Amino acid sequence: VSEQLRIVHAHGDRITVTEPVTGVELLSYVYRAEADWEAPKPYIHPLRTLAGDVVTDYRPNDHRWHKGLSLTASHLSGANLWGGNSYVHGEGYLAIPERVGSMRHVAFDEVSADDSGRVVIAERLTWHPYDGELWAEETRRVEIHDVDLDSRSWALTWTSAITNRRTEPLLFGSPTTAGRDMAGYTGLFWRGPRAFRDGRIIGPDGEGPELMGTQGEWLALSGEHDGADGFATVVFAHAPENAGGHPAHWFVRNEPFAAIAPSWAFFEELALPPGETLTRRYRVVVADGAWGRADIAKYLEGRPW
């Protein structure tokens, strides 16, 4: 039986969730706005295993706008809600500050913990281009659950519903839809710690960096820590209803850094008509140890949606 997880809300800044038996702070959900150039948006960092090992990176020197686990939109109707340089076909990555937008925190509708060991963070956000116009409204639900000291794992379910508030379609794209080969990053994005470079990438039917741009129900990366002994595994899984929408493809790297994104617009733009809502739900499993394909499949099968 799970104990109630502990929540601390530093208003205007962040929400932290702590596992009471180990005393490990599992995550910090930061919603305080940061630098404009980095496309301010909420993010989760640090994200920790039950052993207390951090499995996210924050503002690495190669991409200052990579912040833990966050929802992004690298190409959105000509705007950049990713941060930093913007990809322009034929010219590469350019510093175009007037393209960089933001996802702004509006309010929390729920921040709660129950006796089953589940935490719910329900938030409303607004999406804006550089000039501050309202382009979209988002309802977001981050749930922490299945905290299991025996299997040394826990799970996070992230649901985002984005409603177009423009009078024209919102076009979700990526550097690949803009012309850069096999760089289709957008949507929910995880930047792993530096130690996870060269980590093992595992999918249901294959492994390694060649899983870039492929489709599948789940994808994982395991790496060996610096500092602490041992390994950790981070698993991303699609909710069943995601399959009915615009096709998703995995963005994944273990060189020059570790990253995963279940991209919603890898090869082709996704057009969201005015007033309509794009909903996606994902699960992120954070586990101590180097899980293999069979371990991951067994875990996911044992915890249906």
What does each of the following model-derived ranges do?
Residues 169-243:
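Active-site/ligand-binding surface loops and adjacent short beta/alpha elements
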Residues 37-90, 202-215, 219-221:
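Extracellular/lumen-exposed scaffold segments
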Residues 234-305:
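Beta-strand-rich recognition/accessory modules
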Residues 1-70, 149, 173, 297:
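Beta-strand-rich N-terminal accessory domains
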Residues 4, 70-152:
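Extended, loop-rich substrate-binding clefts of extracytoplasmic carbohydrate-active enzymes
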